[in-house]
């Protein structure tokens, strides 16, 4: 799994239970859910 702030994907999950994989137009990173705002989307 990926640490906070590291790149992630729909397959590669985030280690931190409070983090989500946030897909920005150019990349996806592990951040807190509140930090992931449009136009970014949360990868489930």
From Swiss-Prot:
| Superkingdom classification of source | Eukaryota
Q: Which GO terms describe its cellular component?
A: extracellular region
Q: What Gene Ontology molecular function terms does this protein carry?
A: toxin activity
List all disulphide bridges recorded for this chain: 1-15, 8-22, 14-30, 21-36
What does the entry note on its domains? The cysteine framework is XI (C-C-CC-CC-C-C).
Q: What does this protein do?
A: Neurotoxin. Elicits hypersensibility when injected intracranially in mice. May act via potassium channel currents.
Localization, per the record, is: Secreted
Stated family: Belongs to the conotoxin I1 superfamily.
Tissue expr: Expressed by the venom duct.
Keywords carried by this UniProt record: Disulfide bond, Neurotoxin, Secreted, Toxin
The keyword Disulfide bond is annotated on this UniProt entry: yes
Q: What is this protein called?
A: Conotoxin Rg11a
Q: Answer yes or no on keyword Transferase.
A: no
| Chief place where the protein resides | secreted
